[in-house]
A protein has these predicted regions:
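Short acidic-hydrophobic, aromatic-tinged amphipathic segments that line or gate anion-handling sites
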Residues: 91, 152-155, 244
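Non-catalytic C-terminal accessory region of glycerolipid acyltransferases
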Residues: 6-9, 163-283
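Membrane-anchoring hydrophobic helices of lipid-metabolizing enzymes
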Residues: 1-20, 24-102
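A generic local structural motif
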Residues: 76-77, 89-93, 115-116, 166-169, ...
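Catalytic core of membrane glycerolipid acyltransferases/transacylases, capturing the structured
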Residues: 55-74, 83, 98-158
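Generic preference for hydrophobic
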Residues: 91, 105, 129-130, 236-238
């Protein structure tokens, strides 16, 4: 989309030359770049306005309408916003992600920016996020955007409601509507340390007979501290893909996923240094 905006900026500049003969003017050496930049900025602002309006008109009482156009708006916005925030996302293992089937993607959770990073890093997957219901009150704009992307709010303390979310998420995968992303720790880790894995969310994959894409996200906690002052390096690593057809026991899956995540996280700069193997129970 950004390349299209650059091309359109050039086209607009060329069209302006027809009535005003800009290229024949002595001051064209500085006016042409100004027009190119101005046209590009105008298109970017228009993009943001369209995205803003698209989210504001979302009716939370109606089923979401997950469209390719809206997903393109969001993905392009993230491509523009992250560099402005001086965020550099480093990715590894993306080639492991299944291309022809929906899946359950699981990651550790250290900051509220984690969903945006996952969405940015895995642009080709139609991901629906499971998010805590408190997002509706804390970040209403984000909540509306997640709703439009088939997101599922979950009450972590209400087992009956959580079971409904698992059923709906399973349906999204079974019907090949969306892949689903969940943070199986259940909460944002305030210290960055990996919290015990709640295996209940893994029923989404076992019931849908879907693969589990195990990932880690590291560095998002530093974004607010570094904002505009220095670059923040964020690392999104796809570690493994687990076929649930070979393992239907969610407790065992949770233990395995926790071990895989921990093995990666302890190599990251800034990860808590105490002996994690002795302090974390993944059951």
């Amino acid at each position: 989309m950004l390349k299209i905006y650059l091309l359109l900026s050039a086209v607009i500049t060329l069209l302006l030359d027809i009535p005003f003969e800009i290229f024949k003017q002595t001051y064209s050496w500085w006016l042409v770049p100004v027009l190119l930049i101005g046209a590009f900025v105008a298109l970017v602002l228009l993009h943001c306005i369209v995205l803003l309006v698209s989210v504001l008109v979302v009716n939370l009482d109606k089923p979401p309408k997950d469209t390719d156009f809206f997903r393109l708006l969001v993905k392009t916005f993230l491509k523009m916003a992250l560099p402005i925030l001086r965020v550099k996302v480093h990715t590894t293992g993306l080639e492991k992600i299944p291309e022809d089937e929906p899946f359950l993607i699981v990651s550790n959770h250290t900051h509220n920016l984690d969903p945006a990073i996952i969405y940015y890093a895995v642009p080709d997957a139609r991901i629906a996020f499971i998010a805590k219901k408190e997002v509706r009150d804390l970040y209403p704009f984000v909540y509306k955007a997640l709703h439009k992307l088939n997101g599922l709010p979950i009450d972590r303390e209400n087992n009956r409601e959580a079971a409904k979310v698992i059923i709906n998420a399973t349906k999204l995968i079974k019907e090949k509507t969306n892949s689903v992303a969940v943070f199986p720790e259940g909460y944002v880790s305030k210290t960055g340390e990996l919290l015990p894995i709640r295996s209940g969310s893994l029923k989404i994959a076992t019931k849908a007979k879907a693969k589990i894409v195990v990932c880690t996200t590291w560095g998002t906690k530093q974004v607010p501290k570094n904002l505009f002052r220095r670059r923040t390096d964020i690392y999104f690593d796809v570690l493994d893909v687990i076929d649930t057809a070979e393992n239907q026991q969610t407790v065992e899956l949770g233990e395995k996923i926790g071990e895989i995540m921990l093995e990666s996280l302890i190599t990251k700069e800034g990860y808590p240094t105490k002996t994690q193997e002795e302090s974390i129970d993944f059951q």
